[in-house]
Curated annotation (Swiss-Prot):
UniProt KW Mitochondrion keyword: yes
Protein name: ATP synthase assembly factor FMC1, mitochondrial
GO CC terms in record: mitochondrial matrix; mitochondrion
A UniProt-annotated Pfam family: Complex1_LYR_2
Species name: Saccharomyces cerevisiae (strain ATCC 204508 / S288c) (Baker's yeast)
InterPro entries: Fmc1 (IPR039196)
Role summary: Needed for the assembly of the mitochondrial F1-F0 complex at high temperature.
Length: 155
């Protein structure tokens, strides 16, 4: 087994997965943050007589959370370990070589996966850039359409 080549491929796969999944993780964390802030503010309003120290602490923690700059949104260690396990154990290098499979084909397949993930990410970025109305909510679409016609939508 060609260890340096395997490590390069492994690192490439990890980087491609990180770049591909990070935007969706940021959106998911942003939605969770918004939901938790709303939930905590609602709980605070419901129990106006109680002390809100715990709720205020949690509320401040969620308000400080910035999904864009949070480094914990990278690939989790468990995901990395499972990918490493697949590359080390599940491929069974010696068995595949004994069966006549070329190891170069396995590496080519991994490189194709990396290229696919990079191209898919780039495609999604271009669609978002040149078709900005694609990910708008229904309310935002209604406001946009009303603005085109010259109407104001009440908030």
């Amino acid at each position: 087994m060609d260890r340096p080549r395997t490590l390069r491929t492994y690192r490439g796969l990890i980087r491609a997965i990180l770049k591909y999944e990070r935007p969706s993780k940021i959106v998911n964390w942003g939605n969770l943050r918004k939901a938790m802030i709303t939930k905590l503010e609602y709980a605070k309003k419901q129990n106006q007589r109680d002390s809100h120290e715990n709720i205020n602490r949690q509320l401040e923690k969620w308000k400080k959370l910035d999904p864009v700059s949070d480094r914990s949104l990278n690939l989790f260690i468990a995901d990395s370990k499972s990918l490493r396990s697949i590359l080390q154990n599940d491929i069974k290098w010696e068995k595949k070589v004994a069966q006549g499979q070329n190891v170069d084909e396995i590496f080519e397949h991994a490189l194709d996966i990396i290229k696919f993930l990079d191209n898919q990410r780039e495609y999604e970025e271009l669609v978002d850039r040149y078709n900005p109305g694609n990910k708008l909510t229904q309310d935002e679409k209604v406001k946009r359409t009303a603005n085109v016609v010259g109407l104001d939508v009440p908030t």
